[in-house]
Amino acid sequence: MTLPSGHPKSRLIKKFMALGPYIREEQCEENRFFFDCLAVCVNVQPAPEEREFWGWWMEMEAEEKRFTYTYHFGLFNKAGHWQATTIKDKEVVERLEQTLRGFHEKARALLETFELKLEPADDFTNEKLKLSA
């Protein structure tokens, strides 16, 4: 499949995979890409498959000259689903912001090699952390 920019989707997925354990290929569809990060374990006592994590997820959409994004902070629950939620622990929030910024910088630099920009989606009004310069 070719994206609106003319680049093959499979090539971009391979490049995104090289950024680290962020892309969830099975949740990508058409021109949309899904990334997430399980940054902080809520409680290490349960068995690994029962653990919950604080983290973030980002959706990117390919357009002709840019990728747009939205992201959310929240809880990755025992059922394996994301729930948007307010996180009160300042250290957890700082860790999430750090990992999100790091991913954003890597993704932005990668897309620049394809002469594409990475910008907030036009309808993304809940940007808690400014990522674009």
UniProtKB/Swiss-Prot annotation:
Gene name in the database record: crl
Taxonomy, superkingdom: Bacteria
Family (UniProt): Belongs to the Crl family.
Organism: Enterobacter sp. (strain 638)
Gene Ontology cellular-component terms listed: cytoplasm
Function text: Binds to the sigma-S subunit of RNA polymerase, activating expression of sigma-S-regulated genes. Stimulates RNA polymerase holoenzyme formation and may bind to several other sigma factors, such as sigma-70 and sigma-32.
Transmembrane segments annotated in the record for this chain: none
Entry keyword Coiled coil: yes
Span list, region Essential for activity: 99-122
Protein's name in the database: Sigma factor-binding protein Crl
Keyword Transcription carried by entry: yes
Cellular localization per UniProt: Cytoplasm
